[in-house]
Amino acid sequence: MPDKPTKEKLMEQLKGGIIVSCQALPGEPLYSETGGIMPLLAKAAQEAGAVGIRANSVRDIKEIQAITDLPIIGIIKKDYPPQEPFITATMTEVDQLAALNIAVIAMDCTKRDRHDGLDIASFIRQVKEKYPNQLLMADISTFDEGLVAHQAGIDFVGTTLSGYTPYSRQEAGPDVALIEALCKAGIAVIAEGKIHSPEEAKKINDLGVAGIVVGGAITRPKEIAERFIEALKS
C-alpha cells in the first residue's frame, strides 16, 4: 500500500488526468453480493491511464487496493432517513475510511439537514481535528456550499452533487458554471457529475481544475447503452 500523498503531491498526480469512479449499488447490473467486479473496472481504468479511482464501501476499496496503487477517493454510501445526505454522512463512515489509508475521503458537504445535527463547517473541523493528515474532499451542489467547505479547511471541493439537491442548478450535463466559479475563487476543484464525453472533460480541464472524476460514462454499461439507444430514437 503506497504512502498517503501530500496535497501538493496528489495534485501533481491528478493534474490533466481522469479519475475513474468504480461503483455499483444493490439493484444495479454490476453489483455483486460477493464482490470482485469493481477491482476489474479499476484495473481497466488503470490500464487506460487513469490517474485515480473513486470507490464506495470498505469492501470495494480493499479489493481495489489489492490490484492497484492508484490514489483512491473513498466514500461510504449509507442512508440515514429522514435526512438526505448519504455520502460519508457521519463520523462513523469517516472512521471506517480513515482506517484504509486512502488518499482522500470524500463526504457530503451540502447545507441539507444532517443525521448528526452538525452544520458542515463543524463536521469538517471535527474530522480535521481527528485525522489531521487525511486529505478531504467536499461533495457539494452550489458555490456557497463549496465556499463554506473551503473556508472550513477542506482540501478539495467536488461538484458531485450539483443537480442532485432540489435547490442546485439542474443540468443535463456537467455544471460548468459552478466549476468555473469555484476555480476562479482559488479553490482546488475536483469536477464530478454528469461528465458524459471526452469533449466535456477537455473543456473542464481547460478551466484549471485540480482533477476530473468520470463515472457513469466509463463504468456503467447500462447507462452507456441507454445513451446510444435513446440517440437512435430521437
UniProtKB/Swiss-Prot annotation:
- Assigned protein family: Belongs to the NanE family.
Q: Which GO terms describe its cellular component?
A: cytosol
HAMAP family recorded: ManNAc6P_epimer
What does this chain do? Answer: Converts N-acetylmannosamine-6-phosphate (ManNAc-6-P) to N-acetylglucosamine-6-phosphate (GlcNAc-6-P).
- Look up the EC number in the record and give it: 5.1.3.9
Annotated Pfam families:
NanE (PF04131)
Protein name per the record? Putative N-acetylmannosamine-6-phosphate 2-epimerase
Q: Name one GO molecular function term.
A: N-acylglucosamine-6-phosphate 2-epimerase activity
Q: What are the entry keywords?
A: Carbohydrate metabolism, Isomerase
Pathway membership, UniProt: Amino-sugar metabolism; N-acetylneuraminate degradation; D-fructose 6-phosphate from N-acetylneuraminate: step 3/5
Please name the GO terms of the biological process aspect recorded for this protein, alphabetically: carbohydrate metabolic process; N-acetylmannosamine catabolic process; N-acetylneuraminate catabolic process
State which gene encodes it. Answer: nanE
Q: Do the record's keywords include Metal-binding?
A: no
Which principal EC class is assigned to this enzyme?
isomerase
- From the UniProt record, list the reaction(s) this protein catalyses: an N-acyl-D-glucosamine 6-phosphate = an N-acyl-D-mannosamine 6-phosphate
Task: Write down the InterPro entries for this protein, in alphabetical order.
Answer: Aldolase_TIM, NanE, RibuloseP-bd_barrel
